[in-house]
């Protein structure tokens, strides 16, 4: 059960926290950079948390992008095991999210990008209300068949870099079909973050399933 579902009627509603996980190089940060303006265009007040092993590289990239007030971007150094701070002990990320909410009381949604990990990466429900897992076609169309916890359990599976499919010999239709099958019909969306394709469909889903606007 998500944090939002556990909020009592007499408690102030906190910002929705949306996790973004996936392997190294799948396009998580590129997705964050596409989601920021798409969410802002719809009037959604947002903030961002990024996780890296021992640096703030992704946070600095987002801050330099000019897409969002740099003060609204927080960095968490995850150490050697990026999954630990989003699953086993998410304290650092919870504290970072709480601090962003204190500093920006109107924030409605926090994008929380994990450090690059493997197909077993998942988010604690103590940390996120909704989480998506990003894979890319360059990793091969057999990724869904491997049934990693990230692929199966995520609220949304994003298949990114779809423009590369013909260049790496991937049957995109088969990949999407098999992903939907192993996920029991839960949503699978295709994106090309380099060109911004598929982003609006993700925002539609977040508005409907997380912010309950539709």
UniProtKB/Swiss-Prot annotation:
Binding site for GTP: 22-29
Top-level taxon of the source organism: Bacteria
Xref: PANTHER family: UREASE ACCESSORY PROTEIN G
Disulfide bonds: none
Main location: cytoplasm
Subunit field text: Homodimer. UreD, UreF and UreG form a complex that acts as a GTP-hydrolysis-dependent molecular chaperone, activating the urease apoprotein by helping to assemble the nickel containing metallocenter of UreC. The UreE protein probably delivers the nickel.
Function description: Facilitates the functional incorporation of the urease nickel metallocenter. This process requires GTP hydrolysis, probably effectuated by UreG.
Keywords: Chaperone, Cytoplasm, GTP-binding, Nickel insertion, Nucleotide-binding
KW GTP-binding (keyword) present: yes
GO biological process, one term: urea catabolic process
This protein's name: Urease accessory protein UreG 2
Subcellular location: Cytoplasm
Lineage: Bacteria, Pseudomonadati, Pseudomonadota, Alphaproteobacteria, Hyphomicrobiales
Membership in a protein family: Belongs to the SIMIBI class G3E GTPase family. UreG subfamily.
One GO cellular component term: cytoplasm
Molecular functions per Gene Ontology: GTP binding; GTPase activity; nickel cation binding
